[in-house]
């Protein structure tokens, strides 16, 4: 049961990390107009 939990958490964290990394890496370059969604500093 512990091995199943570890493998599930590993897969979940892997996909979440890849998704967040890809989103943060590609979003500002593809949609520069959406930079205000990250946090308006102006």
Swiss-Prot record:
Q: Where in the cell is it found?
A: Cellular thylakoid membrane
Q: Which domain of life is it from?
A: Bacteria
This entry carries the following GO cellular component terms, namely:
photosystem II reaction center; plasma membrane-derived thylakoid membrane
Give membrane topology per the record.
Single-pass membrane protein
Q: Which UniProt keywords apply?
A: Membrane, Photosynthesis, Photosystem II, Reaction center, Thylakoid, Transmembrane, Transmembrane helix
Location, primary (coarse class): membrane
Q: Single Gene Ontology BP term? A: photosynthesis
Question: Which parts of the chain span the membrane according to its record?
Answer: 6-26
Subunit-structure text? PSII is composed of 1 copy each of membrane proteins PsbA, PsbB, PsbC, PsbD, PsbE, PsbF, PsbH, PsbI, PsbJ, PsbK, PsbL, PsbM, PsbT, PsbX, PsbY, Psb30/Ycf12, peripheral proteins PsbO, CyanoQ (PsbQ), PsbU, PsbV and a large number of cofactors. It forms dimeric complexes.
- Role this protein plays: One of the components of the core complex of photosystem II (PSII), required for its stability and/or assembly. PSII is a light-driven water:plastoquinone oxidoreductase that uses light energy to abstract electrons from H(2)O, generating O(2) and a proton gradient subsequently used for ATP formation. It consists of a core antenna complex that captures photons, and an electron transfer chain that converts photonic excitation into a charge separation.
Family the entry assigns: Belongs to the PsbI family.
Protein name stated in the entry? Photosystem II reaction center protein I
What is the protein's species of origin? Answer: Prochlorococcus marinus (strain MIT 9211)
